[in-house]
């Protein structure tokens, strides 16, 4: 389960970085996440082997269609959960931290209930 969480965190970070930056490299991800470049490089190769990202020879990293779908789903869960927590009075910092953990393990039923409750 731990690897899946790490994988999802990397995909989500690539998606978030791609909103502001055209060319994403391992060093960008390492800097954002506070990990070493070698650790990120290993993770990127694993994601590429799974067909979730493309790594060009110049080091540019992009999400594949499958990677984009996974990243978008995680990002949506993160946003909905953190917004819900803040709406019930939890501080932004705590809401974001808790959402980052919960987004990986929440059931579809519970997530949909939170999403629909917000409407």
Please annotate each region the language model reported.
Residues 26-57:
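Canonical helix-turn-helix DNA-binding module
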Residues 12, 42, 97:
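DNA-binding alpha-helical recognition surfaces that contact promoter or target DNA
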């Amino acid at each position: 389960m731990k690897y899946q969480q790490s994988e999802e965190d990397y995909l989500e970070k690539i998606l978030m970085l791609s909103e502001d930056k055209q060319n994403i490299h391992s060093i960008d991800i390492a800097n954002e996440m506070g990990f070493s470049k070698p650790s990120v490089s290993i993770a990127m190769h694993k994601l590429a082997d799974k067909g979730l990202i493309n790594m060009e020879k110049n080091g540019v990293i992009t999400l594949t269609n499958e990677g984009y779908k996974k990243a978008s789903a995680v990002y949506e869960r993160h946003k909905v959960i953190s917004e819900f927590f803040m709406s019930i009075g939890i501080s932004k910092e705590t809401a974001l931290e808790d959402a980052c953990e919960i987004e990986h393990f929440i059931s579809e039923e519970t997530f949909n209930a939170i999403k629909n409750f917000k409407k």
